């Protein structure tokens, strides 16, 4: 009898024992009277030695990635043939039986080295790409992380609840994916962009601790880090404050990293307000792995004779600056021009600069800076070979543009430590933002977030000044998740709907069922949703969330694997009472 085992179960205790393993041919080497086969399964790989003449005839038919069954006796390898790069490198199986379970066509790319394969090819043959150790381990880690999440939250009395997948269309910013109803002709379901309303209904039901590994769907324009369907950890709690969410998530993420990567994170994460994040880092999702802090030079440059600075300050703008210490020699004119063009992509009028050489400001706008050089040098401890970049504009534009320059410079100067994980909470977000195109307010996060108490009575008088009980969690410059304390009264929810342009009639049409529920004793509640795909992308240092999704779509929201989306038959269209108009 042969004992069926996996490759990782091969060990010295099985020497001289008869064993059977099944897997895929990773490598095959024919040495005439002896053939060596490396077989791979999910767990590891093993070497097979074939010397029997009858079996050699079979191995002559075997090619890479054939699925095979091997039966044989486990032996120690000769010392000189030990492979230290393999976990099972001291052992090999002397083949007694070989069965070809199934053959493999000519490969579209090499499994072990598919760097030359196109992204579309790897997606079309994703089942082959997943045989690569690196890709396989990412998917295994995904399973492990989700298991840790479930265990951790269940131990804390959370209920894993499933919210509907077919819901009423209540657009949350992106377009809904719509599903026509055959029974209710002319009516449509939507696939949920998030379980937001339904988890709030669960709180109203008294199910005070909810979580879900939720599938979400958004019909967004193509972008590299987006997928039309994605997975998030969605959770909600009743009778809490935001600090309860912070503590819960910090403990959860600490457990995830410790139990999956054996990395010990700080027990508490840094916290910073939205305004400070914008002022110091130029981003509401800052990367804090490197310093390179933004300076507000509005006061210091007030006496500069430069008209652009004067006009900006007179028009209630600001002057933001980046000081790059001892690096002026690394910034050629062409590199500075490139940075200027980069700043303009983020609506800045331009990017100004000056360098310090021989205790004088030189280049760029030096002639406008030298009259106040003593003040600047003393205030900012400037030295020779420093270079300063300036953006003068309205506050938000100046912050965002100089923030993007910060990222670009840090990348080009290799200032980013890619071996650390810097988590950060951002809070005190504006509840609303003004859309210049539509001349109206919209929710900065979503319409169900609670205003801070001090703004509730004067909500409508100046919506752009209102701060919300809203928070984001950021990892290495990527927004991982967003949450808030929720509105729990119908009256306040209707006021917020009105501010974002939903009058009572529209609000009733779209959210009547939710507004009704708010009249039946809703508790104080709040929660968060964390992108599992993004978290895993960062944990594995991947370039895209596609790497950590089992069968992802490409950047055009299409699947090269199954060729979806696809046309449907005229019969199906007729059943759904749909017609296609060609325009």
Swiss-Prot record:
Residues 196-199 are annotated as: Aspartate. It comes from the Bacteria. Its EC number is 6.1.1.23. Keywords: Aminoacyl-tRNA synthetase, ATP-binding, Cytoplasm, Ligase, Nucleotide-binding, Protein biosynthesis. One of its GO terms (biological process) is aspartyl-tRNA aminoacylation. GO terms for cellular component: cytoplasm. ATP binds at residues 218-220, 227, 479, 531-534. GO terms for molecular function: aspartate-tRNA ligase activity; aspartate-tRNA(Asn) ligase activity; ATP binding; nucleic acid binding. The record marks 31 as: Important for tRNA non-discrimination. It is found in: Cytoplasm. L-aspartate binds at residues 172, 218, 445, 486. Transmembrane segments: none annotated. It catalyses: tRNA(Asx) + L-aspartate + ATP = L-aspartyl-tRNA(Asx) + AMP + diphosphate. Pfam families: GAD, tRNA-synt_2, tRNA_anti-codon. Signal peptide: none annotated. InterPro entries: Aa-tRNA-synt_II, aa-tRNA-synth_II, aa-tRNA-synth_II/BPL/LPL, Asp-tRNA-ligase_1, Asp-tRNA-ligase_1_N, Asp/Asn-tRNA-synth_IIb, AspRS_core, GAD-like_sf. Homodimer. Aspartyl-tRNA synthetase with relaxed tRNA specificity since it is able to aspartylate not only its cognate tRNA(Asp) but also tRNA(Asn). Reaction proceeds in two steps: L-aspartate is first activated by ATP to form Asp-AMP and then transferred to the acceptor end of tRNA(Asp/Asn). Belongs to the class-II aminoacyl-tRNA synthetase family. Type 1 subfamily. This is Aspartate--tRNA(Asp/Asn) ligase. It comes from Borrelia recurrentis (strain A1). The gene is aspS.
């Amino acid at each position: 009898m042969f004992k069926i085992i996996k490759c990782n179960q091969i060990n010295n205790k099985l020497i001289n024992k008869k064993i059977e393993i099944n897997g895929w041919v990773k490598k095959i080497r024919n040495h005439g009277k002896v053939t060596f086969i490396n077989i791979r399964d999910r767990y590891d790989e093993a070497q097979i030695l074939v010397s029997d003449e009858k079996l050699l005839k079979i191995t002559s038919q075997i090619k890479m990635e054939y699925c095979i069954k091997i039966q044989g006796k486990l032996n120690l390898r000769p010392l000189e043939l030990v492979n230290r790069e393999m976990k099972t490198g001291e052992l090999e199986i002397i083949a007694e039986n070989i069965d070809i379970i199934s053959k493999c066509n000519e490969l579209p790319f090499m499994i072990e080295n598919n760097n030359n394969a196109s992204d579309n090819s790897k997606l079309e043959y994703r089942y082959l790409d997943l045989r690569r150790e690196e890709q396989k381990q990412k998917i295994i880690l995904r399973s492990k992380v989700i298991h840790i999440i479930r265990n951790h939250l269940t131990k804390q009395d959370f209920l894993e609840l499933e919210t509907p997948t077919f819901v009423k269309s209540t657009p949350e910013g992106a377009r809904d994916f719509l599903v026509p109803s055959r029974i209710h002709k002319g009516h449509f379901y939507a696939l949920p962009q998030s379980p937001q309303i339904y988890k709030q209904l669960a709180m109203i039901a008294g199910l005070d601790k909810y979580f879900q590994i939720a599938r979400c769907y958004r019909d967004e324009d193509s972008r590299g880090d987006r997928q039309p369907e994605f997975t998030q950890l969605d959770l909600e709690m009743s009778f809490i404050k935001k600090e309860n969410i912070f503590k819960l998530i910090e403990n959860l993420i600490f457990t995830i990293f410790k139990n999956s990567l054996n990395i010990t994170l700080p027990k508490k994460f840094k916290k910073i307000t939205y305004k400070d994040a914008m002022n110091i880092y130029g981003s509401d999702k800052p990367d804090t792995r490197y310093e390179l802090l933004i300076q507000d030079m509005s006061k210091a440059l007030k006496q500069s004779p430069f008209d652009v600075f004067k006009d900006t300050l007179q028009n209630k703008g600001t002057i933001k600056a980046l000081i790059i210490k001892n690096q002026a020699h690394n910034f050629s004119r062409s590199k500075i021009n490139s940075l200027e063009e980069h700043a303009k992509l983020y609506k800045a009028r331009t990017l100004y600069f000056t360098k310090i050489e021989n205790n004088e400001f030189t280049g760029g706008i030096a002639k406008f800076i030298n009259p106040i050089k003593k003040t600047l040098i003393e205030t900012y401890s400037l030295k020779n070979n420093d270079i300063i970049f300036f953006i003068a504009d309205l506050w938000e534009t100046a912050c965002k543009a100089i923030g993007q320059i910060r990222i670009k410079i840090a990348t080009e100067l290799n200032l980013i430590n890619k071996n650390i994980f810097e988590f950060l909470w951002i809070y005190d977000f504006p509840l609303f933002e003004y859309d210049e195109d539509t001349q109206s307010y919209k929710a900065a996060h979503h319409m169900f977030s609670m205003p801070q108490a001090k703004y509730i009575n004067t909500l409508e008088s100046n919506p752009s000044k209102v701060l919300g009980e809203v928070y984001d969690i950021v990892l290495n410059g990527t927004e991982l998740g967003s949450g808030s304390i929720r509105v729990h009264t119908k009256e306040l929810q209707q006021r917020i709907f009105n501010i974002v342009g939903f009058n009572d009639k529209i609000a009733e049409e779209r959210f009547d069922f939710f507004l009704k529920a708010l009249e039946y004793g809703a508790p104080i509640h709040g929660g968060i949703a964390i992108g599992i795909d993004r978290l895993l992308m960062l944990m594995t240092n991947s370039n895209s969330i596609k790497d950590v999704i089992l069968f992802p779509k490409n950047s055009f929201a299409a699947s090269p694997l199954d060729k979806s989306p696809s046309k449907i038959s005229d019969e199906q269209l007729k059943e759904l009472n749909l017609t296609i108009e060609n325009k």
